[in-house]
C-alpha cells in the first residue's frame, strides 16, 4: 500500500483527486493540502510514498516545493499547464497529468508509480538482507 498526499490550491481539483484515490485499493490518502507549505509538516510527520502535486500555486510552486525536499517521495504533477512538462521530467516526476484529468490517465500514472515503488522496495529488501563480508585489519 502506498501512502499519498494531494497538494493543490483548487478545491475542485482536490475533490476530484481525492475521489480518484479512493477508487484505487493500493493507495491510502494521508492528507489533502491546499498549498505546499501545509504539506511540509505532513511529510515531516508521516512516511509518504507518493505526492500528487499541482505546479501553479501561490507562495510556493510545486516545482519549488520538490526542489526544496532533501528526500523526495515519488511524485506526479497534476496541472493545467503543459509547458512545465519538460522541467517536471527533469525533476524525475513519475508522470505529468494535465487537467482536466480523465480517470484512465490517472490510473496509468498510479500504475507507473506503483511499479517504481515496488522496485524501490525490492532493492531496499535486497540491500537489507545482503550479508556484507567482514574485513579484519591488522
Predicted regions located by residue number:
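CheY-like receiver
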Residues: 12, 37-126
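Extreme N-terminal starter segment of soluble prokaryotic enzymes
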Residues: 1-4
Amino acid at each position: 500500500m502506498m501512502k499519498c498526499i494531494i497538494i493543490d490550491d483548487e478545491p475542485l481539483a482536490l475533490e476530484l483527486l481525492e475521489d480518484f484515490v479512493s477508487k484505487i485499493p493500493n493507495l491510502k490518502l494521508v492528507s489533502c493540502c491546499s498549498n505546499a507549505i501545509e504539506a511540509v509538516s505532513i511529510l515531516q510527520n508521516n512516511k509518504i510514498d507518493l505526492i500528487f502535486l499541482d505546479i501553479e500555486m501561490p507562495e510556493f510552486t510545486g516545482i519549488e516545493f520538490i526542489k526544496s525536499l532533501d528526500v523526495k517521495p515519488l511524485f506526479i504533477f497534476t496541472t493545467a499547464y503543459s509547458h512545465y512538462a519538460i522541467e517536471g521530467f527533469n525533476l524525475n516526476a513519475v508522470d505529468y497529468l494535465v487537467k482536466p484529468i480523465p480517470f484512465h490517465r490517472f490510473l496509468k500514472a498510479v500504475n507507473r508509480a506503483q511499479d517504481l515503488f515496488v522496485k524501490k522496495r525490492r532493492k531496499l529488501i535486497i540491500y537489507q538482507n545482503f550479508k556484507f563480508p567482514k574485513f579484519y585489519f591488522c
